[in-house]
Amino acid sequence: MTVIMDGKKLAELRLIETKNDLLALKDKYQITVKLVIILVGNNDASLIYVNNKVAKAKAIGMDSEIIRLFEFIEEKKLFSVIDDLNCDSTVHGIIVQLPLPPHIDALKLFARIDSRKDVDGLNPINIGYLNIGANQGLIPCTALGCIDLLQYYVTGLKGKHVVVIGKSNIVGKPLSALLLRNSCTVTICHSATVDLALHTRTADIVISAVGKANFLTDKHFSGNLAFIDVGISHIYDLQTHKRKLVGDGDFLKIKDLVKFITPVPGGVGPMTVAYLLKNTLTAAKLIYASIIDNDNEKRLC
C-alpha cells in the first residue's frame, strides 16, 4: 500500500521544535527573533503565501513584519530597504517574496541580502557553502523540507538514485547539491531532456519542481520508491467548477506505482514554511554568536 507523506504533520513537529528553541533562546539571552518579508507588487497568490508565513511565525512566538512595496519601485530603492534591514539588529531573517517584477534583477537582489539573514538561502555565499559541502551557511528551505520528508519516511538515502526534474536556482540546483551531500546518485532533468520517462522509470526517487500541472503520469513511473512533488499549479476543476491546487504529477495515476508520495497541497509546501522559520532561528543564533564573540569583522554594519 502506498504511504502518503504527510507534510502537514511533519511540519507541525518541526514547528514545535522551533517554538521550543525560540523560548529557550529568549529565556537565556532575552532575544526575540524577527523575520521580515518584503512583498513587491499586488500578486494575490503571493499575499496568501506571505500571510500564511506570518501566521505560522506568530503561532510559534516569532515576530514578523511585512513590508509592502509598489510594483514599479526602482531597483535602487528596493536595495536601500534591504540595506536598512541588513543593519537592523532587531531583524534576524529577510526574504523577498517571489515572483519579482521583471525589472528587478533577482540575482543582484539575493546577493544584496546579508548572507547571515538570507533565510531563503539564495545569497551566492550560502549557495557556495552548500555546493562545496561546508557545514555553515543557510540552505534553501524547500530543499531542506524535501530531504526531511525523505529521511522521515524512507529508510536510508545513501546510494539511492534520485531524478530531480527542474534546474532552477530556487529548488532544483540546491536540492541536487543537498542530495549529493546525502550520498545520493543524482540525475538532473529539464526541458531539454530527451525521453524523460526513461530516466524517471529507473529512479529510486523522483522529485519534480517544474510547476506544470499534472504533466507526470503513469507512463513516467514503474514501481519507484518515492515521488516528491514540489510543483504548484492552479487549474479549473470541471466537476466542482472551482479552481484547485495540483502538483506536477497526476496524483491518482501515480500513487499506486510508488511506495511513498507527497500530496499537493499538504506535502512540500508546509515543510518549506517550517524550514523558513527554522532558518530564521538559526540565523538569529549565528548573528548573536558573532556579537558575543565581539568579532568586528562579523558586525552587521
UniProtKB/Swiss-Prot annotation:
GO MF term list: methenyltetrahydrofolate cyclohydrolase activity; methylenetetrahydrofolate dehydrogenase (NADP+) activity
Locate the residues binding NADP(+). 166-168, 191, 232
Q: Which cysteines bridge via disulfide bonds?
A: none
Domain of life from the UniProt record: Bacteria
Which keywords label this protein?
Amino-acid biosynthesis, Histidine biosynthesis, Hydrolase, Methionine biosynthesis, Multifunctional enzyme, NADP, One-carbon metabolism, Oxidoreductase, Purine biosynthesis
Q: Name one GO biological process term.
A: L-histidine biosynthetic process
EC numbers, comma separated? 1.5.1.5, 3.5.4.9
Q: Which InterPro entries match?
A: Aminoacid_DH-like_N_sf, NAD(P)-bd_dom_sf, THF_DH/CycHdrlase, THF_DH/CycHdrlase_cat_dom, THF_DH/CycHdrlase_CS, THF_DH/CycHdrlase_NAD-bd_dom
- One of the Pfam families matching this protein, by short name: THF_DHG_CYH_C
Any stretches that span the bilayer, and where are they? Answer: none
One term under GO cellular component:
cytosol
Pathway(s) of this molecule: One-carbon metabolism; tetrahydrofolate interconversion
Q: Which reaction does it catalyse?
A: (6R)-5,10-methylene-5,6,7,8-tetrahydrofolate + NADP(+) = (6R)-5,10-methenyltetrahydrofolate + NADPH; (6R)-5,10-methenyltetrahydrofolate + H2O = (6R)-10-formyltetrahydrofolate + H(+)
Describe, as the record does, how this protein assembles with itself and its partners: Homodimer.
Family, similarity comment = Belongs to the tetrahydrofolate dehydrogenase/cyclohydrolase family.
Q: Quote the function comment for this protein.
A: Catalyzes the oxidation of 5,10-methylenetetrahydrofolate to 5,10-methenyltetrahydrofolate and then the hydrolysis of 5,10-methenyltetrahydrofolate to 10-formyltetrahydrofolate.
From the Swiss-Prot or TrEMBL record, give the protein name: Bifunctional protein FolD
> Species name for this entry?
Orientia tsutsugamushi (strain Boryong)
